[in-house]
């Protein structure tokens, strides 16, 4: 009888591939640590032999779910975007754990993290509120300063964290996004057709909630949401969109992006606040960022208006290249973090 494949098994295999690639040696899966089953952690942590842990971290009135890889001397926080969860880092985190303590979080409203109530102005789901919460998570874990990587919405939370808490961030890497105010400021028909979640999910409730809840898996069938994953991972991702409270939270985050987040960006620009730590920007080769902003020197040119020390390059793959091409992505990121 064929046994069902669990998310924990998939992460175990990802770790095996990462270790094998790094060492050039084929390893038996029996030599790898046993992973915790894919279920919500109870208490402070649910740990195995030390290579992979899951925990619920209390942050005031909310709880943030984390996956923790390794025990390296340099802490690294990794933040997913829409429509993913911390599971998107399953290929990269094991390799990065050779040198880092890697903390992969589920943002509030996503995955297994809590779903705090929103407000009329959407502030609880602004990038500022989400960034503040991640600082609280890292403080709880004992990390006063850390490297930071974010993809998609997680990239926007990450650059906001670097602007609001510059003393916390050693190095910043932002994958396949530009600042929120720049995105809206450059918006045209091509932008709307490409980045449809910006337009749809920011509409007044309950319209977008009804669309997402009515077809929870549809976002993963659209080219924007497709990526390199099998049915087990798809099922794990889709769980978020079967929960009406989480769907509302995600829409609230997009509403904040169309209002408060723009205000916060504009205030930074007016006050000449910039990202001062070393920054890496990666984007998908042949993806929208490769062509939408050519008049500005590409997305890298846009980031140079916001950051003092930024470098970047294109990575083969689509928007979800951390999953589609984790080897090249990890290699570039490791080089940046080691500089």
Tell where the protein language model's regions lie, with residue ranges.
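Catalytic histidine-centered segment of alpha/beta-hydrolase-like enzymes
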Residues: 318-326
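Conserved HGGG/HGGXW glycine-rich cap/lid loop of the alpha/beta-hydrolase fold
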Residues: 69-115
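N-terminal secretory signal peptides
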Residues: 1-10
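N-terminal twin-arginine translocation
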Residues: 9-17, 25-43
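Flexible "cap/lid" subdomain of the alpha/beta-hydrolase fold that forms the substrate-access gate
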Residues: 44, 50-52, 62-64, 75, ...
